[in-house]
Amino acid sequence: FINILGLALSLACVLIILRYIHQEVTVNHFCKDLENTYLLYCEYEDGTRTISSNEDRNNDPNFIDPLKDPSVLKSTRWINFSEDRITVGKQIYNVKTVVTDSAFLQILPYPSVSGISSLKSPNDAIITRRLAERLFKGDNPIGKTITYSTGDIITITGVIGEPPTKSFLDFDLIVSEQLQHSWSRSSYSLIQLMPGTDFKKLNVKNEKFMKLRCYMDTPTRLQFFPLKDFYFDKTIRIYDNGKSNFQRGNYNNILVLAVVTIALLIIGLFNFINIYTVMMLKRAREFGVKKVYGAGTKDVFAQIFTENFILTGMALCISWCIIEITGGMMEHVLRIPQISNTEFSAILSVGVLILLPLLTSIYPFIRYNYVSPSVSIRSVN
């Protein structure tokens, strides 16, 4: 039992870290056309980059819109409000809001839970399932009205769920950009290019710096940046107060966690193999007798592999129980969000069930298969 429990604890740690690593390296993969989806950034002559949009409020004659290129298939603009509020009845709730249009959910296809995933009128709003549960405690939110921070009454027309993979945006509420004439906030662009388009050539095409009034005539230019690379990127700045809707990652942390995972797995395997080998010492005579009665190499390996397969299966079941029990602590205490990915978890489990018994069987097999039966039979039972 100690052998199984030790392996289970090691596997639980390894699986938790592997699931987190997978979650981090698959950010935005729910976007169906991620390879052709891009953001815009504003670049200054000194190389400074800030995430931006193609909005030209001043109708500046020097402005060149990179999104007028025929290779642009679809685009949207959105505005983040990371410290927003809504009122339901007499209760005020703090929320994170995205102000945008219907194309936003076409490029980033968050799964629809109920209602419609489009903003047909200025007073339409879409909320996340997380916010729906927070506001209405299980009641159907479709058709209900809430008071937005601008004082406007907005109607909930749709509820969206969590995407299958992590998103670079964290928000609770989507409001139509048509609700207000001017939002007095910086906006950001999300673009879908035609398949096969080389964004680097587009950047070369728009490499000329512009002197725009909105940047006080400081030379700037708008460039495309792949959405798939944004999460770990450190070159593009985001000006916020530390409570941004944007989520960013650190690739160096992922590499460190990968090394830790390998170390934990090696330690767990060595522990398991050592204890299993000690147990096998007491059964050396059993293998010697079986060899005398005709057991071959395949028979010895099959027995050792089957035993390790059963032990690994038991350890894996215990490890998943540990993961489920500690899941709430990971999310609420350690602030590490866990996005459930059944497909990846199943692949991990199958991989563990096949590879671990194989790895843990090699040393005992080599040790006892090539020992002569007479030596094994003379061993102390």
Task: Describe the function of each predicted region.
Residues 1, 208-261, 281-282, 326-348:
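Membrane-helix entry/capping segments
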Residues 1-24, 248-285, 313, 317-318:
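Hydrophobic alpha-helical transmembrane segments of multi-pass inner-membrane transport and secretion
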Residues 1-2, 6, 270-311, 370-381:
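Intracellular coupling helices
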Residues 12, 16-19, 308-370:
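Small-residue-rich transmembrane alpha-helices
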Residues 14, 18-139, 148-155, 204, ...:
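Structured, solvent-exposed hinge/loop segments at the ends of secondary-structure elements
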Residues 25-34, 170-175, 238-241, 321-348, ...:
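Short juxtamembrane loops and helix-capping segments at transmembrane helix boundaries
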Residues 98-113, 125-249:
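Mid-to-C-terminal secondary-structure elements
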Residues 196, 202-205, 286-302, 338-349, ...:
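Hydrophobic alpha-helical transmembrane segments
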